[in-house]
């Protein structure tokens, strides 16, 4: 497992690949510090905290795993469903979540039903599609002021259909839904979510009785990527409400548990129960990078908004952060004592992320006042240069004026100092 070596960051005046990797590694380490980590104090956190601090409770805390966690594309809100049937929505106001608004919906799909998946409508700040392994897709409207959810409408697909996955395309034109092994469905969002197309799973996969394990849209919403239990990857073209199979690849030797797009459209990434992650070139569909040193099944993965960090969760309760460009390991974290199913999700507009806490709680990881890696490096460099000049000038009272002038000059020189080599 290749790791990032030490680089003297502060003596570098351009961002080379080595400097970028070192900055990223340092940034990730800082996100685990106490000052840059905050608990998301939802209903689950309150329950766990009250049980943990009670002297009169000896029974174990009942698990309540996260089933699906999604950010709105704007980064202004996120939603997640749990095994108890609840849906929690946060309208995010700050890094620590202290001022954020929580909307809690118990039994969001009705009693005895679980919200197996959810997806934000990217063209609306408060509309979510939810599925529950049933014949219905619920379109919910979340009200931030009244802290309630109302059902806009229900999409029905026939009594024997069991839809367990749904996904809006990035432009908000289409809603995709899928059962495990029967069909995928396409809805036209602009035409009141009318059903326009369906396709049998047997017509997509190479294997008989195959099962859908993962879905993803391309960044432009023109193609659909489907990962199967067999390890096959199918790519479909979506145009004018018609789905057409373009490519089938035997991508993995086990089920493909996750598919993610590089935000720049260069690559897509697949993770599998076979313990491997592959980075594929979007144009050639050739595998460009293999991460095969995880030693455990990949349960989920995500990519940061800059396309620099690949986060991977594995079945043995580990979280890994890799450099997506080089495949080198940047940082890792064991969740072995957390008693939780690992969860990792990057914000869509910054280098912060949400990760599993103990007993199925969630924690927010960030660096204060730093929304991405570039500003993190620039501010670190600036502060160090100012401190060096202050020390060189003696730092005494007799030199206050000269220090002030030097500081001003740093501000003027700054643009030329950060001309990066690409």
Curated annotation (Swiss-Prot):
Keyword rRNA-binding: no
Predominant location: nucleus
GO molecular function: mRNA binding
Pfam families, alphabetized: WD40
Region (Disordered): 388-422
GO biological process, one term: mRNA export from nucleus
Domain of life: Eukaryota
PROSITE patterns xrefs: WD_REPEATS_2, WD_REPEATS_REGION
WD repeat windows: 61-100, 158-197, 207-246, 251-290, 293-332
Subunit comment: Component of the transcription/export (TREX) complex and the THO complex.
Family to which this protein belongs: Belongs to the THOC3 family.
Name of this chain's protein: Protein TEX1
Species this chain originates from: Saccharomyces cerevisiae (strain ATCC 204508 / S288c) (Baker's yeast)
Name of the gene encoding the protein in the UniProt record: TEX1
